[in-house]
């Protein structure tokens, strides 16, 4: 299901009136722009990692991105460039997967593999992920920024399914791929690849496979809104 369309279900009319007015760019919006009048910037338009090669600084009232930042090669650098597009007094609205709800303590992401280059948390010091960013910290460190709001969005998310299929033992073995011991890394890779190839892809059996609830109508994400001070 389209992520922006799903997210808009939990947004009140005031959200659109306050943040998505004027000149809006939707980075990674594809065929599901956050609002009809948004200018979409996607792969065909250039590399969002270096968006200032294509767009002028301080030229947008709102910079929106949904499930795009996690694909960038250098997360802080991309986030900083996107911020430079915002006019003084404008806003940046960013939605990213929540690492506990989406990745479910599995890295690389079991749904996107290496497509996701980082995971995200919200105002927690520690993370199980080797490549985790606190999106709140990234936001507050932007120049002339004020964080308007930051929230976990979990519409229709069934916490009863969280971590049910990939058991504790399997999770431990999966995490061995980052072990300092070569034997553990190899064993972890072999076990996971065996399950993936023989049970989750080639077979109709899904025993042991984690549940990606965002494949239907659930949200498992963080939304943060930042204002650029005049």
In which residue ranges do the predicted regions lie?
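S-adenosyl-L-methionine-dependent methyltransferase catalytic module, highlighting the catalytic core
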Residues: 15-19, 76-83, 91-230
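Conserved SAM-binding loop
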Residues: 9-13, 19-104, 224-226
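Conserved SAM-binding loop and adjacent beta-strand
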Residues: 1-9
